[in-house]
């Protein structure tokens, strides 16, 4: 499990334990379904997002299930609590024209501009997570054959094709990049250190403004756009799932809903009875 996920689950349990302590409960077996329901209700009152509350309940379920299996707890209480209803939120997606404007925003006459353009091109070409992008090593990319090897969530390795535009952008960047023998990462800051997720997030926000893109944009939006545009042009859902590194095709199916939404808008705009 990823470190960020572990930290989130730990934080969920600490928060619930603090609530139980305030209620005078001395151990986990004193917790009843109503305790959990009241806690989740209080979290809503604190304006916690529905997705956050749902994750907190999942954390409790995992904890109790493990405790019961290990004989440390008597009852699996959280399984009696109904999950919050999550609204289906479609991913933010750029149009192909917006992607073109975004990828053209970096200044190709500067080293940082060449780096940023290569990162943007690669992100859109492969649908990588930004955490995977910044960790890429030079040995992970085969520019001659046009593919890369990436280690994603759960230490699962996958092979992803890389298009000619992204390959050329990477070549242009590497031709001007100052060599830092100690660094194997592809994308380095001007100080010779690996680019960070936050650093790149700030850069993409800057380029979105320069490209006059009004949507709320993040590196993940390019991942969403990669998947949606593939499906819109007829790509097989299972192939897209493999390239994204999704363990279940159900996760990938959300992009078909985006496609249907796009079709509905097109029909409404252009059909005489739309």
Label every model-predicted segment.
Residues 1-274:
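Conserved catalytic core of the tyrosine transesterase superfamily
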């Amino acid at each position: 499990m990823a470190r960020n996920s572990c930290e989130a689950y730990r934080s969920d349990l600490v928060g619930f334990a603090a609530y139980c302590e305030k209620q005078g409960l001395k151990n986990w077996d004193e917790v009843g379904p109503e305790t959990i329901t009241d806690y989740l209700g209080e979290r809503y009152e604190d304006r916690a997002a529905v997705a956050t509350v749902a994750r907190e309940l999942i954390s409790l379920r995992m904890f109790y299930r493990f405790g019961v299996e290990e004989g440390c707890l008597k009852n699996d209480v959280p399984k009696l609590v109904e999950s919050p209803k999550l609204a289906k939120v479609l991913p933010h997606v750029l149009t192909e024209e917006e992607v073109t404007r975004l990828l053209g925003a970096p200044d190709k006459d500067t080293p940082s501009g060449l780096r940023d353009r290569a990162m943007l091109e690669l992100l859109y070409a492969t649908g990588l997570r930004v955490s995977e992008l910044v960790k890429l090593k030079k040995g992970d990319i085969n520019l001659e054959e046009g593919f890369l090897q990436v280690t994603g969530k759960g230490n699962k390795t996958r092979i992803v094709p890389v298009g000619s535009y992204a390959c050329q952008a990477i070549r242009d960047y590497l031709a001007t990049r100052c060599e830092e023998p100690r660094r194997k990462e592809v994308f380095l800051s001007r100080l010779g250190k690996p680019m960070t997720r936050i650093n790149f997030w700030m850069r993409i926000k800057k380029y979105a403004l320069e490209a006059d893109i009004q949507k709320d944009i993040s590196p993940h939006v390019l991942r969403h756009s990669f998947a949606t545009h593939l499906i819109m042009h007829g790509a097989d859902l299972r192939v897209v799932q493999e390239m994204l590194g999704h363990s279940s095709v159900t996760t990938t199916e959300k992009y078909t809903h985006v496609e249907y939404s796009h079709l509905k808008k097109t029909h409404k705009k252009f059909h005489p009875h739309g």
